[in-house]
């Protein structure tokens, strides 16, 4: 899994004219858990060490990379251990029109004619900032990804926070194409990564630490708007009763499967189960022909950690009830 998606750090700007060293705090539930320290020079070369401790687990990655004029990596090398302490050794380079990569889980090469951004299997979280800046430079703010895929970036609002020298305006961007949900990253007006935050894990420079509640509120508003649009696009409410006919229905009482069954749903409740011949739908009922496929009650998932996409994914996979373990009850 590409662990850098949710862990972004403040570092280098779009235009850097001199060598620079930067460091940022890693917080887990508001408590100090680690640091990331980066050294950047004017040639576009970065040396970054990223390390944190989460109850004995946690990444410790040292990486070096080079960028071209478009901000896209042409070389990457990383080593250390991942979150579960498994060793990491990863290399990537672009040479003679070919991109080549190798890590613990895959090895490949691909001819490239335009810009393509390599996503390491295990990278320091600053690499998310590198991707954001490259996307902002790219045509239509889109880039092909290696080994596969495409990413895009969109601005989602601004927040004014207290910085080391007074008020600073931070810009919220959301990167699409890395996972089921857009990934949020905060940049300042110079293109420097300003923060990556969540209720669990945050990476942020000390000067912005007190602004975490402001940034979280802005992120949550953007997340709610995205979830609302998704629900509007995907949800369809029947105008009347809903009848599923011609189903092979699972009966949990005796673990049998009964053919030729109908199920009547009214509103958000199953109100009747009967043989097809005994079910007389109302005139305005919506009929779904199961074509003798298997039908069963919704599943329970007894151990989840909810995010904005869990509801849609659960329903798509037949899960209608779930339990979140030790997370924010507002998400439940």
Question: Can you name each region flagged by the protein language model?
Answer:
Residues 27-103, 191:
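N-terminal mature ectodomain segment of secretory-pathway/periplasmic proteins
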Residues 51, 55-58, 64-68, 169-204:
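Gly/Pro-enriched, hydrophobic low-complexity segments
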Residues 205-246, 279-280:
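Extracellular/periplasmic ectodomains of large secreted or surface enzymes and adhesion receptors
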Residues 6-17:
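Hydrophobic h-region of N-terminal signal peptides that target proteins for export
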Residues 289-332:
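Metal-associated gating/positioning segment near the N- to mid-region
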Residues 254-296:
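Histidine-rich, glycine-flanked metal-binding segment
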Residues 18-25, 43-49, 69-77, 97-100, ...:
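Short, hydrophobic/aromatic-rich segments at coil-to-beta transitions
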Residues 31-33, 82-174, 197, 212-223, ...:
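Solvent-exposed helix/loop surface patches that form functional interfaces
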